[in-house]
């Protein structure tokens, strides 16, 4: 089972926010997931709001989960390597 760390879209029409989730790569974007590890709100003022549980992220990265490109950027922003 290939596991990805990716964004799950939530929110209203034209007002999205995203949850950072660990999911099987074969499941749909907004479908079933294994664990939620944070959230990302690009609409927040004055700048985008990012909150990620560093311990959970490190655990999943250590277990071989592959983050998507956007999630990699969010991890760098949050100080997670």
Swiss-Prot record:
GO terms for cellular component: cytoplasm; small ribosomal subunit. SUPFAM superfamilies: Ribosomal protein S16. Keywords: Ribonucleoprotein, Ribosomal protein. It holds the Pfam family Ribosomal_S16. GO terms for biological process: translation. GO terms for molecular function: structural constituent of ribosome. Belongs to the bacterial ribosomal protein bS16 family. NCBIfam families: S16. This is Small ribosomal subunit protein bS16. It comes from Clostridium perfringens (strain 13 / Type A). The gene is rpsP.
């Amino acid at each position: 089972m290939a596991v990805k760390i990716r964004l799950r879209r939530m929110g209203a029409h034209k007002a999205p926010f995203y949850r950072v989730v660990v999911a099987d790569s074969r499941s749909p974007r907004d479908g079933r997931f294994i664990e939620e590890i944070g959230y990302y709100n690009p609409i927040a003022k004055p700048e985008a709001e990012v909150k990620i549980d560093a311990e959970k992220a490190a655990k999943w990265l250590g277990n071989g989960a592959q983050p998507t490109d956007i999630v990699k950027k969010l991890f760098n922003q949050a100080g997670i390597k």
